[in-house]
């Protein structure tokens, strides 16, 4: 059943939130700094903002969606996420004005590992391929075999471990420690903040969408897994538009971790069956993302698997 929660912490955030005391856990909105690296090292074409014909059918003024399917030929809305982080590390090593050949081998010898429900792992695999690094992607047993094979086409190694995303992340973190690899998750937790920089890559998408949209949106709907993507876009929306648009976070009914956490006033783990919305089927939130969404989101809602098809 669909549920809707009004966020009582909107505009103020969780009271006495310890996450706000750590500067590394603050969600970034500095898209200008991100663009410098992306334009120099990745040079992606803009993705289109499309006006949907559904608006007339449902009786609203207009409905717009950002189509990321062809971004960097990846078919992923997180194409510029982990790839941005690796581009930044490459530019720090060889310089923003380095040749394409120098960039291609700039991270040679480095191994990055992560767990993913899909999109983030693909972005890391692509970034490693572009800059000469090695990527190892941990996937849970619920991720389709076809997607695992697709990630391998980017040169990454794939390890299937755990019954869900959280178990595969634990396995990836353990492997990173044992092998001295770099763990690059798009999530954040206590004493781990690298996901904040991954989230910064999503600012490119948000910036493009807001600049292209001819009207100020009244409502912005953002899908959530662990919360990194919507937290980044919502934070930038508040910088760009202020408090005018209503921001709604959308999750599967089987994994309403942002809704449940905001309802509880703190991060909680949720239980549920496996959702067919596999890339959103996450039961534990990113702490930095949740902290930010507590102040930037107005509502949380869920949709059922049946409604999503």
Model region roles, listed by residue range:
Residues 1-309:
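PLP-dependent amino-acid enzyme catalytic core
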């Amino acid at each position: 059943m669909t549920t809707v929660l009004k966020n009582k912490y909107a505009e103020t955030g969780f009271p006495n939130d310890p996450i706000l005391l750590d500067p590394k856990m603050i969600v970034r909105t500095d898209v200008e700094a991100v663009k410098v690296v992306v334009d120099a090292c990745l040079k992606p074409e803009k993705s289109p903002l499309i006006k949907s014909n559904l608006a007339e059918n449902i009786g609203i003024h207009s409905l717009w969606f950002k189509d990321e399917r062809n971004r960097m030929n990846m078919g992923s809305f997180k194409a510029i996420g982990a790839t941005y982080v690796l581009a930044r590390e490459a530019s720090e090593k060889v310089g923003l004005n380095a040749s394409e050949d120098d960039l291609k081998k700039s991270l040679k010898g480095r191994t990055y590992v992560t767990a993913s429900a899909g999109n983030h792992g693909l972005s890391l695999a692509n970034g490693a391929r572009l800059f000469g690094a090695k990527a190892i992607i941990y996937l849970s047993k619920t991720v389709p075999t076809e997607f695992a094979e697709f990630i391998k086409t980017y040169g990454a190694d794939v390890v299937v471990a755990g019954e869900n995303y959280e178990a595969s992340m634990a396995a990836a973190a353990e492997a990173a420690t044992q092998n001295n690899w770099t763990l690059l998750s798009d999530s954040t937790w206590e004493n781990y903040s690298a996901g904040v920089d991954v989230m910064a890559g999503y600012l490119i998408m948000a910036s493009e969408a807001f600049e292209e949209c001819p009207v100020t949106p009244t409502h912005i709907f953002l899908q959530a897994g662990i919360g990194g993507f919507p937290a980044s876009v919502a934070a930038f929306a508040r910088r760009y538009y202020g408090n005018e648009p209503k921001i709604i976070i959308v999750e599967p009914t089987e994994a309403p971790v942002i809704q449940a956490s905001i309802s509880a006033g703190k991060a909680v783990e949720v239980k549920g069956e496996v959702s067919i919305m596999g890339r959103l089927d996450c039961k534990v939130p990113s702490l930095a993302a949740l902290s930010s969404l507590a102040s930037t989101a107005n509502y949380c809602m869920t949709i059922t698997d049946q409604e999503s098809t």
